[in-house]
Swiss-Prot record:
It comes from Methanococcus maripaludis (strain C6 / ATCC BAA-1332). Keywords: Isomerase. Catalyzes the reversible conversion of ribose-5-phosphate to ribulose 5-phosphate. This is Ribose-5-phosphate isomerase A. Pathway: Carbohydrate degradation; pentose phosphate pathway; D-ribose 5-phosphate from D-ribulose 5-phosphate (non-oxidative stage): step 1/1. InterPro entries: NagB/RpiA_transferase-like, Ribose5P_isomerase_typA_subgr, Ribose5P_isomerase_type_A. SUPFAM superfamilies: D-ribose-5-phosphate isomerase (RpiA), lid domain, NagB/RpiA/CoA transferase-like. One of its GO terms (biological process) is D-ribose metabolic process. Its EC number is 5.3.1.6. Homodimer. HAMAP family: Rib_5P_isom_A. CDD domains: RPI_A. Belongs to the ribose 5-phosphate isomerase family.
Length: 239
């Protein structure tokens, strides 16, 4: 008897298949006895699941460093042994997703899931930082379509909003679904989303972090390699 499709069943999209394609290829880059930074988000979760399969099938000794409560749960389910940042001397490779990738500079905007602070700590700490994305995430100019998230200390949110308004931006406090009020990060902070012109990713990253009360922002100026899923193949972009 054929299964009746329910209204809330998720139907795979072209984007989903491209994400899975890059996730599978990224999982092959991990070698035995590596410590791996585990990013957060839909593409990173696929990578975590594929890495878990390799660990089981090939009996690999690999440890993961999660960047969020969500990635911790996905990794635990996938059978990846986990350690904290202070337990590992170094991270061999970090694999993460992105909301936008600039074609020319490989700078990124991350943080759609509100995990960018922990992601940046782990990603920047790694010997090699690899980003996974489908071709729809590629842009010519960073920040034209996606706002930059700022994780802010609640005590300072109003002064940060005023500072951003004086910079001729339109900041918005991120609110969640399922509850009233602002989104609260794993670190207990709020998120302000702001559209801002980004001519130099590194300068913008530093400038936003210099605003008192901003813990971290979603501009990532450092990235070693990007795996882009296209309909024909996985393209590898390097700096």
């Amino acid at each position: 008897m054929a299964r009746t499709k329910k209204a809330n069943d998720e139907v795979p999209t072209d984007s989903d298949s491209l994400k899975l394609k890059v996730a599978k290829q990224a999982a092959k880059l991990v070698k035995d006895e590596m410590v791996v930074g585990l990013g957060s988000g839909s593409t990173a979760n696929l990578f975590i699941q594929e890495l878990g399969k390799r660990i089981v099938e090939e009996e690999l000794y690999i440890y993961g460093v999660p960047t969020s409560f969500d990635s911790r749960m996905v990794a635990s389910t996938a059978g990846i042994p986990l350690i904290s940042l202070d337990q590992c001397g170094e991270i061999d490779i970090a694999v993460d997703g992105a909301d936008e990738v600039c074609k020319s500079t490989l700078s990124l905007i991350k943080g759609g899931g509100g995990c960018h602070t922990m992601e940046k700590i782990v990603d920047y700490h790694a010997k090699e930082f690899i980003v996974l994305a489908d071709e729809g995430k590629l842009v010519d100019s960073l920040g034209d379509k996606t706002p930059v998230p700022l994780e802010v200390i609640p005590f300072a949110y109003s002064t940060i909003l005023n500072k951003l308004l004086k910079m001729n931006t339109a900041p918005v406090i991120r609110t969640g679904s399922g509850k009233m009020g602002p989104v609260i990060t794993d670190n207990g902070n709020m998120i302000i989303d702001v559209f801002i012109s980004i001519d130099d990713a590194e300068e913008t990253e530093i400038m936003l972090n210099n605003i008192p009360g901003v813990l971290e922002n979603g501009v990532f100026s450092k990235c070693d390699k990007v795996l882009i899923g296209t309909s024909k193949k996985v393209e590898i972009l390097k700096k």
